[in-house]
């Protein structure tokens, strides 16, 4: 959404721009590649990543391609990828081979790159994708890969600040000097964003029961709301955690099942959708 205009992209390669006041389609175009990431609108351009590990920059005025760049493609990847992010005059893209690459926003000139994924000398079959959206705080970028590392790098030149072994799919959240993140084992971790020192770890439980795939909790979060950390499972379980101590303050069931997409959070309510496309409001 930008300036009363709504950008639509999909897995068929369609890109459309609508006027939100009356629903009129302003322009429509398409590319031959499925679009896997949400779009980023920045300084007059729409940026997104496609299934062949390519980033596109499209002019929001007319839908014409401004530039594109392709890095090494990966056959093993997640169904969706995270969105590019913007920092000053650069667009930073997370690719499915574990690379973060920064580009000049209007020319597509690469500025720097950093690999977030752990390099395996044994297997080429690991998923290296970056499913968690990179987070920019001050002059640093924090990024988590599906197989390998949580890293902090300079948004200016890509120089690595620190890295720790951790894998996951959920976007971290930062408050003050603390970074909160859920790893692939369903553990909520609080660490120092400057040094990577771990303050506490809380086990949200990877499985609802047993260890079968159908019982994976697939936690969404963390979400910092009113100075509390909210975490929501696929089965509709809500766990509220203290950001200071990591203690689980409450566990409740919100009454819906099949929660896969992150909520939309407003000032006094949040909205969730389930795998059947039903939308729910919670206050």
Kindly give the residue locations of the regions a language model identified.
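Extracytoplasmic beta-rich repeat domains
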Residues: 1-3, 25-43, 65-88, 110-138, ...
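Post-signal-peptide, soluble extracytosolic/periplasmic N-terminal scaffold domains
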Residues: 1-11, 17-19, 28-29
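Structural signature of WD-repeat beta-propellers
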Residues: 3, 10-11, 50-51, 95-96, ...
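Loop/turn-rich, solvent-exposed surfaces of beta-rich toroidal or solenoidal domains
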Residues: 178-193, 197, 201-240
